[in-house]
Amino acid sequence: MKILVLAVHPHMETSVVNKAWAEELSKHDNITVRDLYKEYPDEAIDVAKEQQLCEEYDRIVFQFPLYWYSSPPLLKKWQDLVLTYGWAFGSEGNALHGKELMLAVSTGSEAEKYQAGGANHYSISELLKPFQATSNLIGMKYLPPYVFYGVNYAAAEDISHSAKRLAEYIQQPFV
């Protein structure tokens, strides 16, 4: 299975978790990691190139830190520009039908804060629903996300283990 990881962190060079994830995933021959902020420092996304890349892979992974209960802005811009009517959706937009979409998300807060009654009031599943809705619209199979909670409190060993677990997780088959 060919996997395309779109790593979207505006400060990847100083990131703790997302940088470790990208480095670990890059070690695998069937995984291509693209750092979108490095690829497009001016945010001028090459739509044709991105669409072609998406067509070449079986599974697409959006990797990002949770920013204001969503993704960093470049991922939203990427979706707005790349997932076009007639290509990704609409009566003739079937380029991604049958492919898989997965999210790899890191949060600053602990897991217990992402639930009813928790500090953030909503589960991570609820907060990520727009990605699931997008996946449904464009005919992709939405897979369970990989979430690493509590980056702000994580030990280096936990981060290293999370990178290895992520590599295993995104390569496993989902029925």
Swiss-Prot record:
Pfam families: Flavodoxin_2 (PF02525). Keywords: Oxidoreductase, Stress response. It comes from the Bacteria. Induction: By heat shock, salt stress, oxidative stress, glucose limitation and oxygen limitation. The keyword Oxidoreductase applies. It is an enzyme of class 1 (oxidoreductase). GO terms for molecular function: electron transfer activity; FMN binding; NAD(P)H dehydrogenase (quinone) activity. InterPro entries: Flavodoxin_fold, Flavoprotein-like_sf, KefG/KefF. Its EC number is 1.6.99.-. SUPFAM superfamilies: Flavoproteins. The keyword Iron-sulfur does not apply. Belongs to the NAD(P)H dehydrogenase (quinone) family. This is General stress protein 14. It comes from Bacillus subtilis (strain 168). The lineage of its organism: Bacteria, Bacillati, Bacillota, Bacilli, Bacillales. The gene is ywrO.
